[in-house]
Curated annotation (Swiss-Prot):
Functional pathway: Amino-acid biosynthesis; L-histidine biosynthesis; L-histidine from 5-phospho-alpha-D-ribose 1-diphosphate: step 6/9
Identification of the protein by name: Imidazoleglycerol-phosphate dehydratase
PROSITE patterns cross-referenced by the UniProt entry: IGP_DEHYDRATASE_1, IGP_DEHYDRATASE_2
SUPFAM superfamilies: Ribosomal protein S5 domain 2-like (SSF54211)
Superkingdom, taxonomy of origin: Bacteria
Assigned EC number: 4.2.1.19
UniProt xrefs under Gene3D superfamilies: Imidazole glycerol phosphate dehydratase, domain 1 (3.30.230.40)
Organism from which the protein derives: Nostoc sp. (strain PCC 7120 / SAG 25.82 / UTEX 2576)
Length: 209
């Protein structure tokens, strides 16, 4: 068989861009992602710390993100935080499509001063979260640090990825959380890359994800 006999994947003809609009009685969330972006981010969720973390995903994952959200902030940030995770997860899944040709797996170890966090993920089609953060304070600014886990639970379930988060070191809550989002971004960037050697085939011995 000649090299030319293999199907060629023309990346320019396969834009990996998706938009999802989710409206509930509690929130109104619009997310657009471009998996082959340059790290451009527009985030206005009404939760400043979450916006800051979304910028980390975009910048370090080289994923263009536009996240606009309105929610019942007068109650607390929980519903908006969770629904942003849900909608972003759905947008990622939609942009990935059948996941043909992607590397699929990603792993990254991110330091931020004294904090060190490892993230490993698999766009497997099987949602699972193993969460190993020990965040010492209840809040970073006005952000409830319990919501970090809730964000990733929502993201994992709706993108159908397997995600492992391990904290190896860290005493500053902001540093621990930001290192987590940076590690996630770099691991995701690795996993969503198109592998030209796969020539558009699904990265599974089963032939389906």
């Amino acid at each position: 068989m000649q090299i030319s006999d293999y199907p060629q994947l023309n990346l320019s003809s396969v834009p990996r861009i998706a938009s999802v609009h989710r409206i509930t009685g509690e929130t109104n969330v619009q997310v657009t992602v471009n998996l082959d972006g340059t790290g451009i981010c527009k985030a206005a969720t009404g939760i400043p710390f979450l916006d800051h973390m979304l910028h980390q995903i975009s910048s370090h994952g080289l994923i263009d993100l536009d996240v606009q959200a309105k929610g019942d902030w007068e109650i607390d940030d929980h519903h908006t935080n969770e629904d942003v995770g849900i909608t972003l997860g759905q947008a990622l899944a939609k942009a990935l499509g059948d996941r043909k040709g992607i590397v699929r797996f990603g792993n990254f170890l991110a330091p931020l001063d004294e904090a060190l966090v490892q993230v490993a993920l698999d766009f497997s089609g099987r949602p699972h979260l193993s969460y190993g953060l020990q965040i010492p304070t209840e809040r970073v600014g006005t952000y409830d640090t319990q919501l970090v886990r809730e964000f990733f639970v929502a993201l994992v379930n709706h993108s159908q990825m397997t995600l492992h988060i391990r904290q190896l070191d860290g005493i500053n809550s902001h540093h621990i959380i930001e290192a987590t989002f940076k590690a996630f971004a770099r691991a995701a960037r690795m996993a969503i890359e198109v592998d030209p050697r796969r020539a558009g085939t699904i990265p599974s011995s089963k032939g389906v994800l």
